[in-house]
Regions:
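Acidic, low-complexity, intrinsically disordered interaction modules
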Residues: 21-63
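Surface-exposed ligand/attachment interfaces on beta-rich extracellular proteins
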Residues: 1-17
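Intrinsically disordered, low-complexity segments enriched in small/polar residues
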Residues: 4, 17-18, 29-31, 76, ...
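Short, solvent-exposed coil/turn elements at secondary-structure transition points
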Residues: 9, 23, 66-67
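Terminus-proximal functional modules
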Residues: 2-5, 26-27, 84
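Intrinsically disordered, low-complexity, charged/polar segments
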Residues: 48-85
C-alpha cells in the first residue's frame, strides 16, 4: 500500500483508512464526505481516540484493509499538491 494525497483522490464515504498529518502522526479512522457540513465536507473520524480531523491537517491517506499493521509515515510531510497560500 502507498500513501495517497487527499488532493489527488479522496476515499469513498464511510471507507476505513489510515491517515497521516505532520502534527498528529499516523492513525486509523473512517472518512466521511458531507458536502453541507459547515466545518468541512472532508472529515476523518478517528477509530483510536475520540475526535475528528480535517483533510488539511492530515493530507495523506491509504486504505485500511483491516489486516495491515500501522504503516510508517510518508516520506514527505505534505504532498506536492497541498494547497498553500
Amino acid at each position: 500500500m502507498e500513501w495517497i494525497s487527499f488532493f489527488e483522490r479522496q476515499p469513498e464515504d464511510g471507507q476505513g483508512i489510515w491517515y497521516y498529518g505532520e502534527h498528529i502522526g499516523v492513525w486509523a479512522g473512517e472518512y466521511s464526505y458531507s458536502p453541507n457540513d459547515p466545518f468541512s465536507p472532508h472529515l476523518i473520524f478517528c477509530h483510536e481516540s475520540p475526535g475528528l480531523v480535517d483533510r488539511m491537517d492530515a493530507p495523506w491517506w491509504m486504505v485500511d484493509d483491516g489486516v495491515m499493521n500501522r504503516p510508517i509515515k510518508p516520506a514527505k510531510d505534505y504532498p506536492d499538491d497541498y494547497p498553500s497560500g
